[in-house]
Every structure is written in C-alpha cells, then in structure tokens.
C-alpha cells in the first residue's frame, strides 16, 4: 500500500490526536454518550432513494480550508451554511472535523446537524475504532473510510464498529486497486470515487468513468471532486451517476445553497429556510 506523503503526515498526526483525546475521554465514556444521542437520520438511504429517482443526490460539504488550498471560506458559519444547503436541495451534508490540516472541528459537525434535517457524514481520517464511536457520539450519521489510508483488516474492523453503533459507511477509492480492496473487504452500498490524484493533486472526472464498469450495480457510486459546472453534472448523469460530493465549488460561492441550486437544479427556486446566508 503506497501512502502519499501528505496523507502520511496526516495519519501520523491523527494517531497522536487520538491518543490525546483518549486520555481526556475514555472509550467507555463515549459509548455512554452514544446511548443518549439522536437516532441516525439514514445517510445511505437518503442518497439511494434520491438517486433511484434519477435526481441529483448531493452531499454538500461544510469545509473551511484544505492543505492544498489554505482557507477556502473566511465567512465560515456552519449552521447558516447547513441551512443554505438544505434550502438549495442537498440530500446530505459532509462536515470536516480534522483540526490540524483542514481547520475543522467537532463543533462544526454538531452546529451543522442541529441547523437542518439532513443526514451528516463526519469527514475525517478514520484509523481507530475510538473515532468511529466518537463520530456517533457527536451525532454523525455516517463515516468516511479512505482505502489509501487503511489496511484491509483496519477497514473491516472500523466498518464493524460503525455497524454496531448505527453508522453508515462511505468508502472512498482513487484507483482500480483500491476499488478491488474495498469491494472485497466491505459490503457498504456507498462507494465514493475521488477524482483527485492524492500523489499529484490533479483532478480528472475520467477516474469515475473508468472505474464505473467495475462497480457492481447494487452499489451507489458517488463522484467526488472536480464537479464545477453543468457540463460536469450532465456528463455524470449521462453515465448513470447521480450522487455527488461537492465542497470547494460551493464554499467559494457567496451563497452556497444558491450555487448548489444553480449547479444541480437550475429549474428550481431556492426553498424558504428561515434566516440564512441566502
């Protein structure tokens, strides 16, 4: 397993972060917290239901910064962004919680989820069962497993813990080898194809199109990164891909929900959502 240099740094730091968190809140304490959180909102089911109708099933990302781009959005108010996304027709939310590399926060996930009715994925680098239980304790409905960051045994263990605490799993792949490992190891219906090459950071929608024939029809393909305009959306829909994870294109827009609407639902008007940045 070849781990890109940036990812390697992130994983080293992540292990240190988990050790520090565990010293403050034990796994047993997290398990107790899980018992009192709201029931999961059904992340996978929401996406599958929408995509079966051949309508865009959009996972809209709440993302302040990234290692490659720095700060993406200065005016970063997770609750308002979440309401804006819901008004714009998002099916689910993705919230970055990694602190050191993405300027994320657990609080951002909680704020975003409390501000809307949408299911939420905790977008982080999951390497330890502790983080999975922690995700559910925070109120997340789904976790991300990045194949390039994990051995097969780790993936299976994390997915088992997720199932036990009621979380859906979105597995992310970047190439054919990772796809093969994911399909062999996990039975999650959600397969995300990241169009960004983690070694070069180049983005190509061809990544999704090339892997598509190798993904069983009973899995939902989610194309991630590189969806910037209507032509990109239409290219995917022509190829029967109706689920999208989009972050930067929305975060750079003055009104994220309005940009979502323009990109995916140009025939609709923005739904009323109460006070929001739209």
Swiss-Prot record:
One of its GO terms (biological process) is L-tryptophan biosynthetic process. The keyword Disulfide bond does not apply. It is an enzyme of class 4 (lyase). It catalyses: 1-(2-carboxyphenylamino)-1-deoxy-D-ribulose 5-phosphate + H(+) = (1S,2R)-1-C-(indol-3-yl)glycerol 3-phosphate + CO2 + H2O. It comes from Pseudomonas savastanoi pv. phaseolicola (strain 1448A / Race 6) (Pseudomonas syringae pv. phaseolicola (strain 1448A / Race 6)). GO terms for molecular function: indole-3-glycerol-phosphate synthase activity; phosphoribosylanthranilate isomerase activity. CDD domains: IGPS. Pathway: Amino-acid biosynthesis; L-tryptophan biosynthesis; L-tryptophan from chorismate: step 4/5. Belongs to the TrpC family. Signal peptide: none annotated. PANTHER family: INDOLE-3-GLYCEROL-PHOSPHATE SYNTHASE, TRYPTOPHAN BIOSYNTHESIS PROTEIN. Gene3D superfamilies: Aldolase class I. Its EC number is 4.1.1.48. This is Indole-3-glycerol phosphate synthase. InterPro entries: Aldolase_TIM (IPR013785), Indole-3-glycerol_P_synth (IPR045186), Indole-3-glycerol_P_synth_dom (IPR013798), Indole-3-GlycerolPSynthase_CS (IPR001468), RibuloseP-bd_barrel (IPR011060). It comes from the Bacteria. Keywords: Amino-acid biosynthesis, Aromatic amino acid biosynthesis, Decarboxylase, Lyase, Tryptophan biosynthesis.
